[in-house]
Amino acid sequence: MSVAQHRSHYSERVRGMREPARAHNTGSFGCNAAFYNGTMSVYDSCPELCDDTYRIRLIDPRDAEDLLAVYGDKLALPFFNSDNCHGANFYCRTLHDVQESIKYWLIEYHENRGFVRFAVESLETEGVIGTLEMFRREADDYYDDCGILRIDLGVAYEREDVIYDILNLVSVPFMTLFGCAKIATKAPIYAVERRAALADAGYAAKRQPLIGHDGTHYYDYWQMLRD
């Protein structure tokens, strides 16, 4: 069942030891970050975030083949955040499924302004190793005025070092781009590499549930506050 058939976040929007966490990357923007705080929206023009390892950019139809290795891998499914997504598991059996998902993501970006789906491009391999989704949530629960970050990675990259580097690259810039006071992402108890990366990156585990559109309570969220 493809992502395109189920991910309707637009309706929700309207309603080893590692070194200590270093200073968060403010991001190398393709455009002036201050401009996004003023007259321009991320939905008008999507910037890129870059460091020496990764490039974070708007998803492109040409990413489909690389992403089949992510969404076509059943071992990756438990790490995808399907909260409030109407029971989807996001497994894509074919290249066509991925292509349809990308079409849907781009419609949500360009037409509905529901969320932004970013590709995570490895500068070392020159391939796309996963995606990030980000949107600003408005709701009558703890996660109001909160950026919800969804992280979908290939299983080879579900590692503490990789996730930490991605979080360090995007967390603060995403709060700026989306005008959020805080940012949150899900990490279930079995996602040990992800949880370690979140702790190192300055996120804290929260007990408060995210309450879905149908009243379902979702747990295992980690949050960072904007300075």
Give the residues covered by each predicted segment.
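Intrinsically disordered, low-complexity terminal segments enriched in Ser/Thr
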Residues: 19-23
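Conserved hydrophobic beta-strand within the GNAT/NAT acetyltransferase core sheet
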Residues: 183-187
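GNAT-family acyltransferases
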Residues: 4-12, 24-156, 173, 177, ...
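Conserved acetyl-CoA-binding loop-helix of GNAT-fold acetyltransferases
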Residues: 160-173
